[in-house]
A protein has these predicted regions:
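Transmembrane alpha-helices and adjacent helix-loop boundaries
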Residues: 1-234
Length: 234
């Protein structure tokens, strides 16, 4: 088992390094933006795999969690003097809190009804950011979002992609190790039969909440990255 994990870690590291080297051969800013967008999509998909693929929970509200992370980073970067780097963990924390709120109904509703509840969360977020213009800027959005920096200089397009690749590799490694253990087995048991899972000691509701939080955090970080790279969000 230990050798298998080590081999997988080496493969992930090698793939990340190969992707980072390949970035040097992308010849224009458009291609670099596409590569960066692929990284953010991977972060969202990795979290969704935990929630849907392992825990079997249906969610249609990930766009709302993406927006929560994006606006948290935008407000932190544009309305405070805090470092843009601190906006990332703050965005993850806000998204995690929203993930807990979305998970609360999962104790009572399941299947398509849970999907409808999560969809309603996304609608509420969309209405909130579009109607509360004093805070979120409404249709005009938020400008002046400070990007991530290196040596006091804003990230270049290449650096954004390199950072995205690094985050994807770390996220993949962390989630794989997390899901290979007790937590992953608990989530798979939920997908198979919640009653049977509870009968063998799995804390069903806690496992559901943790799955929602993991998916929310990855989406929130992806949203924060998009807001900081564009320096504008609406």
């Amino acid at each position: 088992m230990a050798m298998g994990r080590l081999a997988h870690s080496i493969v992930v590291l090698a793939a990340a390094l190969a992707a980072a080297v390949a970035v040097r051969y992308l010849d224009n800013d458009y291609h670099l933006r596409i590569a960066f967008t692929m990284c953010t999509y991977y972060l969202c998909a990795a979290g969704m795999n935990v929630l849907v693929g392992y825990a079997g929970q249906k969610s249609l509200g990930q766009a709302g969690l993406f927006a929560a992370g994006a606006y948290a980073a935008a407000l932190t970067s544009s309305h405070t003097e805090l470092s843009a780097w601190l906006a990332l963990p703050l965005a993850a924390a806000v998204a995690a809190l929203c993930g807990v709120l979305v998970a609360l109904p999962s104790l009572r509703v399941k299947g398509p009804y849970l999907a409808m509840v999560t969809l309603a969360f996304g609608v509420v977020v969309e209405k909130l950011v579009s109607e509360w213009t004093d805070v979120f800027g409404g249709a005009q959005g938020l400008y002046g979002i400070r990007p991530l920096t290196w040596n006091d200089q804003p990230f270049t397009s290449e650096q954004w992609v390199w950072f995205g690749i690094a985050l994807c590799a770390v996220t993949h490694w962390l989630l794989r190790n997390l899901l290979a253990g007790r937590f992953g087995r608990a989530l798979l048991s939920l997908q198979a039969d919640e009653i049977a899972a509870a009968s063998v000691g799995v804390r069903v509701y806690r496992a559901k909440v943790m799955a929602f939080v993991v998916a929310a955090v990855t989406c929130g970080i992806a949203g924060a990255l998009v807001a900081q790279q564009n320096q504008y969000i609406n």
